[in-house]
Regions:
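All-beta strand scaffolds that present successive hydrophobic residues in beta-strands
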Residues: 1-2, 22-25, 44-47, 67-70, ...
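Acidic, glycine-rich loop-and-beta core segments that form the ion-binding/anion-interacting portion
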Residues: 57, 62, 66-74, 79-94
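Soluble extramembrane regions of membrane proteins in the secretory/endomembrane system
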Residues: 104, 110-114, 119, 129-132, ...
Length: 181
């Protein structure tokens, strides 16, 4: 546990770069820039970690493919998790809680494809999931409770399959910036 105050003066709790087959299991990560940071990491698993009170992201994926994160807690971070410029990421049985503020999300997805989000809980976040440039995503059996927005799906997304999710007591359930013609 460390307690960084400013982003530029803090490091990441766990930082993996250009790695394969990593196993990040059973850690408590608190007070860093990003709790867990993956860049160019493949075929890896993040399981049963608690990442909270980090300045930026509880978990941050960049250019990382064929990875999975299961049964983690992301609470009170600048944003819970960001998955960017990645493909074939499995996100299952995680808790995204109390990620509040300007630009704060439970889960931020930017330019990802061929991925799945299943059996997660998004509770009391500014936005549960924000999607931009997402394609071929399966989003099912998740619970969205007490968020400002449960989901924001930008018009740049395509082939997003949303089914069997529960939306409870959110200010808004689903929004987009697109329109049908």
């Amino acid at each position: 546990t460390a307690f960084g105050v400013e982003e530029q003066q803090s490091g990441n709790g766990i930082h993996c770069w250009k790695s394969d087959s990593m196993q990040i299991i059973g850690n408590s990560i608190r007070g860093h820039r990003d709790g867990i940071y993956f860049e160019f990491v493949t075929h890896s698993v993040i399981w049963r970690n608690i990442s909270q009170d980090n300045i930026r992201y509880g978990l941050h994926f960049m250019f990382s493919n064929n990875d999975a994160y299961y049964s983690n807690v992301f609470e009170g971070n600048g944003a819970g998790v960001a998955v960017m410029f990645s493909r074939e990421v499995t996100m299952e049985n995680n808790y995204f809680e109390e990620n509040w503020g300007d630009g704060a999300y439970g889960l931020l997805l930017k330019e990802i494809s061929n991925s799945s989000i299943t059996n997660n809980r998004f509770t009391r976040n500014t936005t549960g999931i924000y999607m931009e440039g997402v394609s071929r995503l399966q989003l099912q059996k998740n619970v969205f409770r007490g968020n400002g927005w449960a989901m924001k799906i930008q018009a740049s997304c395509m082939e997003v399959n949303v089914q069997e999710n529960n939306f409870l007591a959110n200010t808004f359930d689903v929004g987009t910036n697109g329109s049908l013609v």
